[in-house]
């Protein structure tokens, strides 16, 4: 019988789970190489290698924006364009040829990526009950670890299948460890129904695993940053329930808006005291910026529920997303469509008419009709806007980094002959830690990729309750 080979890097044990951008330390388990080879039996013969194997599964939580050649996929929408010209990236976006680039693995490799993560979860669940305890652990501690690891594997598997669903719809639900030399197709010739896939599997996995996970306090300890905890399972459950209650899926899922509202409310009831909106500053723009960038543990960001833990990064991690006047490659450039979607600070819409996408209607004119009651001024379009606009978009005249953004033709951020200069008049501010630009770009900062924030739970509740016909006061 052919033995499955698994590769391990033993330095991971000393690294804890402060995960780096390493995609997959163990992912080549079907390849054969001369060093660091362990069979499946050897990996699960001791707790140390089992622990390493399990923690590596966290590497399948994707971090960063989905990209083609260093440019975010938002550029494929009407909300942004890419300024990144290298390797034909801009051309790929403009003509929709997203697969031409060899760097489009986050599109072409998604299927393989998540099934590899799922396989690792299945392998752990198959073997962990037979792994001997570590010498220094008591029987009670070992039993706790086994319970936690199994619960985390169930969560991660459910999350990976949910990500697959968002891209492909229901895909084959593989819960066993398939033999690469065996029959891989006979049991997976038909798609599961939406109810079988989401309601009977994903939602059940999330509900069943919650009790075995760490509580938030244990997850927040220094050795466990980023570990899956009970609130994460409940939060993902709320997200999935909201999708399933929508008009798109409700007839197949059987889930109502009220059930989705109840799911969000259960999080607020059981875990709401542990989380809150990140309001550590009197400036709303700063609060929003920090809610996105601040680390959940070291920087006490209690709005973050579920995120991909990462390490502090420097200039090399952001220069492809930074304005050319700062020495970067421009990257994702927000469009006027996106800017126009932001309301005024008083909550009113700046324009009088919008289409179904949320963009203002131009009706053949150079500018959309202004809602005069909103206070919007066409000669000062960025003043008194929703503060999230200034936290998301770098526009002309704003002070940022080591200078003032100037996108006028031939100026600092739109110089003649620079192929990466913004084509829209805007650059991205969100997700870019400005502190990295200090001292000649020698600063560093965490760039954690948030998957679920507490703000989403509040919005899930409000949206579902509103659709269910809840009272205005409750909404």
Please provide the spans of the model-predicted regions.
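Conserved, well-structured interaction surfaces
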Residues: 46-64, 87-168, 187-200, 204-222, ...
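Aromatic-lined, polymer-binding surfaces characteristic
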Residues: 164, 170, 179, 195-196, ...
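Membrane-proximal, proline-rich intrinsically disordered regions
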Residues: 22-73, 383
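Structural helix-adjacent loops and short alpha-helical linkers that scaffold large soluble proteins
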Residues: 134-147, 249-255, 468-474
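Short coil/turn linking the two alpha-helices of tandem helical-hairpin repeats
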Residues: 165-166, 172, 217, 240-252, ...
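Bacterial Sec-dependent N-terminal signal peptides
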Residues: 1-34
């Amino acid at each position: 019988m052919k033995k499955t080979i698994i590769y391990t890097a033993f330095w991971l044990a000393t690294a804890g789970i402060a995960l780096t951008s390493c995609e997959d330390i163990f992912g080549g388990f079907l390849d054969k190489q001369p060093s660091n080879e362990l069979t499946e039996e050897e990996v699960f013969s001791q707790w140390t290698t089992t622990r390493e194997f399990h923690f590596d599964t966290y590497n399948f939580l994707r971090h960063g924006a989905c990209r083609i050649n260093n440019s975010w996929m938002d550029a494929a929408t009407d909300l942004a364009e890419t300024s990144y010209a290298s390797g034909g990236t801009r051309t790929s976006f403009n003509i929709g040829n997203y697969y031409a680039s060899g760097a489009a693995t986050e599109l072409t490799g998604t299927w393989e990526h998540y099934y590899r993560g799922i396989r690792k979860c299945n392998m752990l669940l198959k073997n962990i009950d037979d792994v001997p305890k570590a010498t220094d652990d008591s029987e009670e501690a070992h039993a706790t670890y086994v319970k936690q690891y199994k619960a985390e594997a169930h969560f991660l598997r459910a999350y990976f299948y949910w990500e697959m669903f968002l891209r492909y719809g229901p895909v084959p639900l593989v819960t066993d460890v398939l033999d690469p030399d065996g029959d891989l197709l006979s049991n997976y010739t038909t798609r599961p129904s939406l109810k079988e896939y989401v309601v009977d599997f994903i939602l059940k996995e999330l509900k069943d695993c919650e009790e075995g996970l760490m509580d938030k306090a244990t997850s927040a300890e220094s050795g466990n940053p980023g570990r899956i905890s009970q609130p994460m399972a409940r939060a993902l459950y709320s997200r999935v329930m909201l999708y399933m209650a929508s008009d798109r899926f409700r007839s197949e899922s059987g889930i109502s808006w009220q059930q989705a509202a109840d799911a969000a409310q259960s999080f607020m009831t059981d875990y709401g005291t542990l989380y809150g909106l990140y309001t550590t500053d009197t400036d709303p723009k700063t609060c929003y910026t920090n809610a996105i960038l601040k680390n959940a543990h070291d920087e006490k960001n209690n709005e973050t529920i579920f995120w991909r833990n990462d390490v502090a990064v420097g200039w090399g991690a952001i220069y492809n997303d930074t304005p050319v006047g700062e020495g970067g490659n421009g990257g994702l450039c927000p469009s006027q469509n996106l800017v126009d979607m932001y309301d005024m600070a008083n909550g009113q819409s700046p324009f009088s008419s919008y289409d179904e996408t949320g963009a203002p209607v131009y009706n053949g004119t150079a500018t959309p009709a202004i809602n005069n009651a909103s206070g919007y001024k066409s000669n000062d379009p960025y003043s008194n806007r929703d503060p999230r606009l200034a936290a998301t978009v770098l526009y002309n005249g704003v002070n940022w980094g080591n200078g003032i953004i100037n996108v006028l033709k031939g100026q600092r951020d739109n110089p003649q002959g620079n192929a990466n200069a913004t084509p829209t008049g805007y650059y991205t501010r969100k997700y870019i830690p400005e502190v990295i630009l200090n001292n000649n770009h020698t600063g560093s900062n965490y760039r954690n990729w948030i998957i679920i924030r507490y703000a989403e739970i509040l919005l899930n509740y409000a949206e579902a309750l509103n659709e269910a016909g809840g009272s205005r006061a409750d909404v």
